[in-house]
Amino acid sequence: RRGELTQAFRDVVDAVIAGGGMVGGLGERYTRVAAAHAVHNGLTVLPQTDKFLHGTKVAYGILVQSALLGQDEVLAQLVQAWQRFNLPATLAALEVDITNREEFDRVIAHTLRPGESIHYLPVTLTPEVLRAAFEKVEYFSR
């Protein structure tokens, strides 16, 4: 605010650089952030997520993508990094209640719309598979 370089600003810069670097290693040309952006798009159906930046929701989506791809080791490492940089590692951090079935079904349906980039992933996608991936992220983030 006053031309000072604060620790909070440094933390944000570190998170952006670290997050961007990790994203590049998550998949091949078409899958790097395929699910991450689709998850962002799905979350936008809930008005309470409007206050969160695009990148914040994509960051959570990266965790879901790792879960979908069965990358448990990567998921564990990313959860630790997200927690260190105060990025959302749980849906609650985005003010989303995974136990609200009606609300969460809307997120899943929107995430899985035809044409969403999540369909580039080399996995069979169903609402149940995607829900399990979200649940896995929540489990790893405890």
Regions found by a protein language model. Give the residues of each.
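Active-site segments that bind and position negatively charged phosphate/pyrophosphate groups
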Residues: 1-81
